[in-house]
């Protein structure tokens, strides 16, 4: 039989969506401050003319397909094949760790995994049964920058102590543009596992004898904080392009991709 499951999430995301005074208090920023920030970001830092604050549509969908077939080869041998595939496409999956992050900061995340399992169950005698299993498992996940940014990502610019005045009250927040700190990164794992168990049942004791062999191939690119970040204090320094600090993690090799092969066994 075959089963398909589909899930879809279209709840919007809100980025400093200022409509009332209560919104200003919640975000610690006024619309006039956002307007000034965005004008600087566009004229001096190349931010897109597309909207960066407000309400945005968000799409996340997951599809899962499961299939199974049982094949009675003969009176004593049953072959079962199962396959489970899951695919997820999550647009604007997450932003960053500043209080307010522009829309361009939000990353996309895609992933899929597939598990294929074949089981041969053989009844050798009334007291003896053998079960042989072979499984391949694939996992892949990729995180990519927002479509408004290059695929290789760009540095972040974090403006701290952004002041807004509402009535007689001063409010402060931090606003960020540029690339999210994780992207781009990807993880791909292949696992091949062979298990053979023999079950011997007596009137008083049930015995299990088995062997398990598992081979894993991993290929990963971890990109956390490797795009770099500039720190500014206040909008005046942001406008004058005078950061007080720059930080970046760098790879010590030309290709930072991590490749690993492991073999595990048990009896």
Residue positions per predicted region:
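A subset of solvent-exposed loop/turn segments in beta-rich extracellular surface proteins, enriched
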Residues: 14-48
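Surface-exposed cleft-lining segments at the edges of enzyme active sites
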Residues: 51-55
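Glycine-rich, acidic and aromatic/proline-enriched surface loops and short helix-turn segments
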Residues: 4-6, 34-40, 85-87
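Predominantly transmembrane beta-strands of Gram-negative outer membrane beta-barrel pores used
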Residues: 1-9, 14-24, 66-70, 82
């Amino acid at each position: 039989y075959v089963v398909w499951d589909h899930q879809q999430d279209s709840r919007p995301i809100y980025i400093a969506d200022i409509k009332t005074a209560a919104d200003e208090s919640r975000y610690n920023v006024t619309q006039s401050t956002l307007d000034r920030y965005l004008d600087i970001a566009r004229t001096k830092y190349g931010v897109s003319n597309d909207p960066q604050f407000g309400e945005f549509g968000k799409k996340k969908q997951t599809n899962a397909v499961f299939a199974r077939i049982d094949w009675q080869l003969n009176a004593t041998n049953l072959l079962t094949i199962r396959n489970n595939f899951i695919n997820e496409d999550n647009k604007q999956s997450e932003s960053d760790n500043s209080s307010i992050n522009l829309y361009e900061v939000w990353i996309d995340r895609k992933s899929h995994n597939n598990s294929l399992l074949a089981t041969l169950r053989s009844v050798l005698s009334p007291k003896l049964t053998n079960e042989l299993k072979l499984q391949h498992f694939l996992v892949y996940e990729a995180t990519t920058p927002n479509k408004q940014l290059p695929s290789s990502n760009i540095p972040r610019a974090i403006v701290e102590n952004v002041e807004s005045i509402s009535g007689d009250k001063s409010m402060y927040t931090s606003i960020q543009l540029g690339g999210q700190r994780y992207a781009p990164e990807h993880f791909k794992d292949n696992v091949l596992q062979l298990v053979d168990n023999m079950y011997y049942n007596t009137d008083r004791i049930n015995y299990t004898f088995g062997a398990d062999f598992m081979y894993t191939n991993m290929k990963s690119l971890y990109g956390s904080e490797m795009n770099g970040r500039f720190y500014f204090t206040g909008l005046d320094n942001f406008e004058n392009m005078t950061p007080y600090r720059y930080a970046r993690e760098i790879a010590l090799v030309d290709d930072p991709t991590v490749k690993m092969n492991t073999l595990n066994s048990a009896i």
